[in-house]
């Protein structure tokens, strides 16, 4: 250790101890680390809260911000918390309050917030403390307004002032403001629009703005500090609602004020007014006589131009100064303004002021290019701003600017606003008539409103190709022009097909708002600022026409369960940071909040990340622990893991696999893979899209979309043509990713899982504070600590109640003694000179203590009545029973556990809900079949590859000959090719024309209604481009048959063991190696001694044995051997397995068919050309189908025109091989028969279905019996 030389001193230092700096730094760092760990970053295991969360909740309770009361401004909750419990700045406190109010952050929110509390994307919550300057005008009812700083006269800095004031919200509706907040002095900024409208407020004051969000124009709140030049703010311009007749005197006073401002003068000893308009002059004189009265002089003179100028002069201003016009005395022109009394007046009074003002110094004119304009000029910048603001109160939008040096103009510069001025305000007399003539003379098609909704036209035209009817209607008109919507809204809306788009555009174009472009945001220094508390959902109010709002909060009912009975000494309290008040060390927490809502935090050298869980499941686990409190740790862990299935995130989503869950629950640490929910959809144009309806927990919605767009741009994500956010508060998350036509949906989805946060991991680290020390806990340990805490709470609560009951019983026993000796007590009290003497006497008389004696002396005379005496005796009896019950609770642990169970059951039933997050299996994990019920379903697969499964009970069993029930609605020329009943656990093998085989469990097919088409298998399986289904086979297991036989168009056949095709590869496997220009035609299951029948397109057929000697088994990656040879223009049409007592039924393109007994086909050697099965006839056409049937087999056929026939094989004439067949159906001109197939519903156990074919001429399938001929179309 280095020697230390102490500096010379004056003897005032009593003692200095040398300390090793390394040891001191180590000690200080450990102290700091533990302070952060215990005091800030980690939750307490008992209530699951960090100190700041606990303090916010307790401060809100202590301040009365409870769920049964109105919301309180968030700043009040923050101020109470910071002032009494948490002196670490308001930002962290407000962030905590906001998070506890966000339903996407907490599974069970503890704060009920109103206002803008952010979003799962990049939208931040509104700031806690935001205000506007004192001169901001707040809109009131009936056109009145008041400066916010004048609402409460003499309001103190940083004060909350109760008021009862009706203001207007963003929609122009009256709402109640019950508090004015004087927020002290703060730095302010002024937002000015290009038109000249201004609002001054703090940087965190929110204004309603029009923002482009993913190409959609959206109304969002932005802070003044976030607003930039070029942004668009929203101004409310709904004309005021007027009520009753105007006050005549006030109206005349306003008229006279407007006249003197525009055409008069008022000196200290002389006032006057003049005008060339006699009607206007007369109106002003009459107003003067009404308002002022007294002596005045009227004269006239001829001007240089020859006009008559009428003049009013007043030389005695005594009466004038008694009126509210006295403020004009000695006022310079540059200092003129609208006085407060006029702002406080209703719209009828303000209208009179504006009419007189514009009649005096206002002008209307038609400029070049048919532009009509109204203007007003003044030397006062303040007056120009006031006039512009007052016009806006009437719904008139104007521009204000400096015209020349020291001259300011207010201009109404387009026809729509001129018409609004003319209907809502108007000139006084003569000029109004001129304005009417000018408006009438203009063509209705010129001078229209230039007010548009920025970005609306682009948004509309972008969706023309897939969402709109009559695209040209939106390319030829100014659909973003508000005035165009005003005149033609019904016609425009009629062209819009999508209801969500209709809602967006109509809300923006209904005329309530004006979208003003921001010109500048400037620093306006430090000044007093104010805000209002408005008791509505969005808390909006109008200031200078801008739309402002605030956030408010109160505790949720579930948060009250966290704080329940905290006043019954259930937890320990400690002094706050300055010793003034007490705060709880932990909350009673009547439900397991740590696991229900989870927690996250980063401390020094450690971090916690506990996922949220389902309250029902947690309660079930707690109940087991209460009933089996003496179980060992291993048994308890297994039991709670059986009941708590896994995390349950507020944003739902999927958990992939259970290994990470098991790790987290068994060791306290684990990586849990989570995934969003994606559905494959196909629109009316056949385009495939991936639709994301749920995102993983804590994934930022906006950043996720941006990430996809960026990776598509850089080429990392392929196959995506468009990404669109269609989500809203109404529909929730809906991100539509449009897939390119040549892309495979499953491949794109897998890439999204790999390269984006559509699949991510939640790193569980179940670390919390236990007895002041951080510990990593297993699931069962967390639940046990919670149970121990609840047992302690019950003991402390019961002890408190027992003490209070004993105190009450003690007093009642004294009262009963007094009532038994009532006369003696009354005599003693009357004889006592002082209360103290009476108290001592009562103690000696009744043998009681001072507490009982005082209660007797405090007893009211009315309690001496007989009924009251009996009530005291009854109360004592009840309390004695209660004391015995409370004592029993303290004596019996099983009763305490029962109370916890009953109270938690009540909470879970009241606030619990179903699990949101589903757990799915992965390879090597629990099989999906363990999670899916085994049930019978109907599987439907169409010719073009659409597949679905349907519950069997949606189809009713019918007798033969019934009409059936409506089945799938299909596209033109599509038919149901495969239709069978199977178990949800059965395998379905899809063989494609390219020689590959894919498999899926029946439950993996989309479940759909009878009438739904389903989804294309290319979206369910990773089909390659151009692959089509050649055959579908259903098996329960790979032991159902020994062999699988495949046949190609070139006549090759291959027999392989069915078990060779048992593969887990999601991308399919090779079923047969195809040679050039060949494709797979058929696939059948075959026994070891079966026979095969091959039929060619030209009518040749060959039957041969499939024994191992005739057709040896081969591996999958082989081409097979020649099963049938063809002439040059022939090919294989079908592959069939021969069954006894069956027929080969063939059909031709001309609509002819026949059936031939299978015995007529001789056994031959493999590889020949076979024998003739039908005689070719040009009129009858070529062969289109050949299937093996029995007499009762049902079959159907479809034509190129969409016609369909359904009949039984018995109705088709039996004939020999070398015949042409008979007519199966009549064909229309140009129609041909496309295909025949056995009716797949034969295997559906009585299920009957009617297949719908879009645009088909025939929509009916008929069952038939032996006495019915086939129906023809």
From Swiss-Prot:
CDD domains xrefs: Hint, TOP4c
PTM statement from Swiss-Prot or TrEMBL: This protein undergoes a protein self splicing that involves a post-translational excision of the intervening region (intein) followed by peptide ligation.
GO biological-process terms attached to the record: DNA topological change; intein-mediated protein splicing
EC number: 5.6.2.2
Annotated Gene Ontology cellular component terms: cytoplasm; DNA topoisomerase type II (double strand cut, ATP-hydrolyzing) complex
Placement of sequence motif GyrA-box: 958-964
Similarity comment: family membership: Belongs to the type II topoisomerase GyrA/ParC subunit family.
Record key words, sorted: ATP-binding, Autocatalytic cleavage, Cytoplasm, DNA-binding, Isomerase, Nucleotide-binding, Protein splicing, Topoisomerase
Protein function: A type II topoisomerase that negatively supercoils closed circular double-stranded (ds) DNA in an ATP-dependent manner to modulate DNA topology and maintain chromosomes in an underwound state. Negative supercoiling favors strand separation, and DNA replication, transcription, recombination and repair, all of which involve strand separation. Also able to catalyze the interconversion of other topological isomers of dsDNA rings, including catenanes and knotted rings. Type II topoisomerases break and join 2 DNA strands simultaneously in an ATP-dependent manner.
Species annotation: Mycobacterium leprae (strain TN)
Protein name as catalogued: DNA gyrase subunit A
Active-site residue numbers: 130 (o-(5'-phospho-dna)-tyrosine intermediate)
Subunit structure, as described in the record: Heterotetramer, composed of two GyrA and two GyrB chains. In the heterotetramer, GyrA contains the active site tyrosine that forms a transient covalent intermediate with the DNA, while GyrB binds cofactors catalyzes ATP hydrolysis.
């Amino acid at each position: 250790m280095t020697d230390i030389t102490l500096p010379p001193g004056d003897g005032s230092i009593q003692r200095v101890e040398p300390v090793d700096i390394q040891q001191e730094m180590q000690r200080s760092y450990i102290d700091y680390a533990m302070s952060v760990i215990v005091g800030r970053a980690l939750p307490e295991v008992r209530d699951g809260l960090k100190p700041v969360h606990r303090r916010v909740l307790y401060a809100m309770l202590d301040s009365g911000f409870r769920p049964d009361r109105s919301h309180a401004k968030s700043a009040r909750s923050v101020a109470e918390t910071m002032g009494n419990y948490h002196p670490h700045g308001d930002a962290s406190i407000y962030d905590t309050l906001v998070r506890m109010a966000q339903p996407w952050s907490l599974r069970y929110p503890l704060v009920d917030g109103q206002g803008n509390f952010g979003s799962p994307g990049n939208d931040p919550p509104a700031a806690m403390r935001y205000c506007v300057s004192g001169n901001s005008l707040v809109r009131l009812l009936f056109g009145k307004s008041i400066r916010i700083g004048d609402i409460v006269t003499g309001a103190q800095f940083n004060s909350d002032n109760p008021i009862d004031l009706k203001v207007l919200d963003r929609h122009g509706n009256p709402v109640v403001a019950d508090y004015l907040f004087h927020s002290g002095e703060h730095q302010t900024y002024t937002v000015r629009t290009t038109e000249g409208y201004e609002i001054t407020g703090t940087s965190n004051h929110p204004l309603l703005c029009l923002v482009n969000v993913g190409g959609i124009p959206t109304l969002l709140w932005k802070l003044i500090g976030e607003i930039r030049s070029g942004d668009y703010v929203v101004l409310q311009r709904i004309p005021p609602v007027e009520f009753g007749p105007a006050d005549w005197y006030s109206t005349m006073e306003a008229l006279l004020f407007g006249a003197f401002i525009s055409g008069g003068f008022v000196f200290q000893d002389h006032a006057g007014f003049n005008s060339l308009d006699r009607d206007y002059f007369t109106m002003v004189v009459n107003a003067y006589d009404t308002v002022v009265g007294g002596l005045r002089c009227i004269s006239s003179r001829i001007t240089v131009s020859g006009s008559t100028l009428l003049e009013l002069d007043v030389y005695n201003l005594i009466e004038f100064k008694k009126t509210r016009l006295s403020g004009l005395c000695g006022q310079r022109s540059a200092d003129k303004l609208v006085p407060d009394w006029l702002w406080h007046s209703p719209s009828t009074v303000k209208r009179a002021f504006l009419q007189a003002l514009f009649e005096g110094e206002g002008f209307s004119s038609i400029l070049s290019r048919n532009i009509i304009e109204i203007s007003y000029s003044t030397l006062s910048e303040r007056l120009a701003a006031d006039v512009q603001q007052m016009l806006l109160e009437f719904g008139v939008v104007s521009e204000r600017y400096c015209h020349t040096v020291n001259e300011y103009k207010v201009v109404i510069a387009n026809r729509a606003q001129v018409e609004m001025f003319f209907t809502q305000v108007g000139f006084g007399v003569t000029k109004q008539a001129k304005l009417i003539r000018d408006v009438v003379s203009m063509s209705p098609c010129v001078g229209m409103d230039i007010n548009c909704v920025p970005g609306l036209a682009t948004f509309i035209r972008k969706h023309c190709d897939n969402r709109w009817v009559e695209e040209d209607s939106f390319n030829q008109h100014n659909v973003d022009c508000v005035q165009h919507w005003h005149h033609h809204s019904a016609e425009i809306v009629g062209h819009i097909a999508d209801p969500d788009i209709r809602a967006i555009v109509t809300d923006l174009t209904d005329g309530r708002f004006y979208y003003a472009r921001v010109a500048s945001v400037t620093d306006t220094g430090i000044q007093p600022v104010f805000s209002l508390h408005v008791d509505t959902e969005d808390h909006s109010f109008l200031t200078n026409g801008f739309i402002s709002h605030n956030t408010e909060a109160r505790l949720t009912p579930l948060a009250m369960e966290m704080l329940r009975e905290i006043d019954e000494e259930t937890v320990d309290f400690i002094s706050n940071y300055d010793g003034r008040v007490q705060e709880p060390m932990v909350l009673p927490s009547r439900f397991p909040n740590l696991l229900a809502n989870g927690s996250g935090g980063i401390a020094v050298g450690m971090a916690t990340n506990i996922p949220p869980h389902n309250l029902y499941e947690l309660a079930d686990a707690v109940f087991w622990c209460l009933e089996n409190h003496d179980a060992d740790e291993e048994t308890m862990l297994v039991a709670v893991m059986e009941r708590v299935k896994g995390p349950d995130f507020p944003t739902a989503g999927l958990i992939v696999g259970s290994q990470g869950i098991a790790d987290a629950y068994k060791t306290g640490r684990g990586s849990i893979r989570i995934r969003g929910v994606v559905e494959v959809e196909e629109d009316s144009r056949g385009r495939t899209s991936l639709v994301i309806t749920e995102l993983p927990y804590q994934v930022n919605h906006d950043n996720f979309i941006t990430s996809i767009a960026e990776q598509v741009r850089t080429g990392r994500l392929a196959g995506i043509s468009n990404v669109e956010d269609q989500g809203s508060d109404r529909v929730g998350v809906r991100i539509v990713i449009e897939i390119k036509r040549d892309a495979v949906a499953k491949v794109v989805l897998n890439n999204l899982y790999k390269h984006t946060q559509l699949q991510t991991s939640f790193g569980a680290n179940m670390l919390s504070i236990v007895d002041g020390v951080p510990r990593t806990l297993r699931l069962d340990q967390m639940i046990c600590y919670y149970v121990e805490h609840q047992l302690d709470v019950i003991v402390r609560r019961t002890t408190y109640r027992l003490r209070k009951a004993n105190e009450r019983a003690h007093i009642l026993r004294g009262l009963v003694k007094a009532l038994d000796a009532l006369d003696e007590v009354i005599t003693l009290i009357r004889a006592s000179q002082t209360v103290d003497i009476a108290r001592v006497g009562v103690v000696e008389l009744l043998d009681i203590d001072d507490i009982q004696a005082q209660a007797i002396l405090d007893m009211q005379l009315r309690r001496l009545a007989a009924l009251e005496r009996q009530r005291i005796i009854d109360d004592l009896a009840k309390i004695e029973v209660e004391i015995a019950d409370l004592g029993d609770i303290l004596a019996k642990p099983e009763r305490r556990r029962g109370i916890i169970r009953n109270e938690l059951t009540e909470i879970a039933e009241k606030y619990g809900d179903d699990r949101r997050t589903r757990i799915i299996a992965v390879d090597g994990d629990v099989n999906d079949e363990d999670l899916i019920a085994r049930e019978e379903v109907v599987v439907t697969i169409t010719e073009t590859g659409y597949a679905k499964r349907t519950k069997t009970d949606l189809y009713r069993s019918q007798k033969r000959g019934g009409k059936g029930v409506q089945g799938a609605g299909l596209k033109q020329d599509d038919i149901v090719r495969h239709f069978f009943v199977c178990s949800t656990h059965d395998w379905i093998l899809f063989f494609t024309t390219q020689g590959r085989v894919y498999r899926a469990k029946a439950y993996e097919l989309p479940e759909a209604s009878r009438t739904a088409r389903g989804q294309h298998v290319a979206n369910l399986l990773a089909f390659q481009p151009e692959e089509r289904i050649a055959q579908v086979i259903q098996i329960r297991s790979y032991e159902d048959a020994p062999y699988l036989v495949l046949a190609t168009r070139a006549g090759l056949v291959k027999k392989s063991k069915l078990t060779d095709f048992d593969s887990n590869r999601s991308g399919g496997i090779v079923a047969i190696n195809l040679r050039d220009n060949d494709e797979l035609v058929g696939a059948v299951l075959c026994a070891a001694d079966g026979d095969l029948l091959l039929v060619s397109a030209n009518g040749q057929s060959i039957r041969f044995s499939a024994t191992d000697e005739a057709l040896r088994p081969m591996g999958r990656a082989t081409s097979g051997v020649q099963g049938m040879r063809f002439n040059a223009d022939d090919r294989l049409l079908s592959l069939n397995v021969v069954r006894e007592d069956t027929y080969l039924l063939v059909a031709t393109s001309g609509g002819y068919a026949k059936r031939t007994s299978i015995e007529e086909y001789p056994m031959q050697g493999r590889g020949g050309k076979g024998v003739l099965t039908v005689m070719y006839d040009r009129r009858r056409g070529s062969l289109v189908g050949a299937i093996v049937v029995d007499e009762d087999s049902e079959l159907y056929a479809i034509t190129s025109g969409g016609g369909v026939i359904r009949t039984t094989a018995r109705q088709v004439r039996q004939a020999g091989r070398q015949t042409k067949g008979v007519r199966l159906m009549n064909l229309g001109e140009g129609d041909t028969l496309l295909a025949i197939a056995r009716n797949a519903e034969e295997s559906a156990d009585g299920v009957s279905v009617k297949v719908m074919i879009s645009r088909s001429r025939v929509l009916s399938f008929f069952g038939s019996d032996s006495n019915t001929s086939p129906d023809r179309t």
